[in-house]
Amino acid sequence: MKSARIRIRKAESADVGRMRELIECSVRELQAADYTPAQMEAALEKVVGVDSQLIADGTYFVAEVRTSSAHPEAGQPSGRKDSGVGWVLAGCGGWSKRKTLFGGDHWSGRENALVDPKHDAAKIRAFFVHPAWARRGIGSKILEACEIAASTAGFTSFELGATLTGAKLFKERGYVEAEKIEVAVKSGISLPVIRMVKRP
């Protein structure tokens, strides 16, 4: 596959349908080495998904890629009038000024109260990359955009709840493990998650 142009922009409500498809594909394919099928399906049903609060806050980003040749299997068409032929949705991720550490709209453990950038860490949230674009720098570019935006908002430290799969990326970018968490999803099924932090 030839090299691709990558651009990062803020997610919009019109992106939600494509983001959901991307997230489901990302979880089922990229996390298969770290979680059982039952864990992945339970996560999609109860925890993982689009967080519309991030979109409303203007803190959710999507990565679009455009290659020099057509790759219809790679990601979902962006659907934007200014996107042009060949742009596809390849990843998403955001940051938050709220207490929620992880989880989509349907997760019962959400806490939408605001945090104080003088004392609290910004939350790095909801990172997913389409399998066709894995290990091509998509996640790193989204993370960079999130850290810059959160820093501009006054935050100096960052915190996240990483999947076993995603923890590899964050470790490479300076995040360290703070604790291991077992998230009870449904009867008999839990998800191991790693809380990670990055400080100045």
Language-model regions, residue ranges each:
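C-terminal "cap" of GNAT-fold acetyltransferases
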Residues: 156, 163-167, 173, 179-200
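Hydrophobic beta-strand residues of extracellular immunoglobulin-like
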Residues: 59-63
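Intrinsic disorder/low-complexity segments
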Residues: 68-83
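A short beta-loop-alpha structural element at the N-terminal edge
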Residues: 6-21
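Conserved GNAT-fold acetyl-CoA-binding loop/helix
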Residues: 24-50
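Conserved acyl-donor/pantetheine-binding loop and adjacent beta-alpha core of acyl/acetyltransferases
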Residues: 57, 79-134, 149, 182-192
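Conserved GNAT acetyl-CoA-binding A-motif
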Residues: 143, 150-163
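Conserved acetyl-CoA pyrophosphate-binding loop and the N-cap/start of the following alpha-helix
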Residues: 133, 137-145
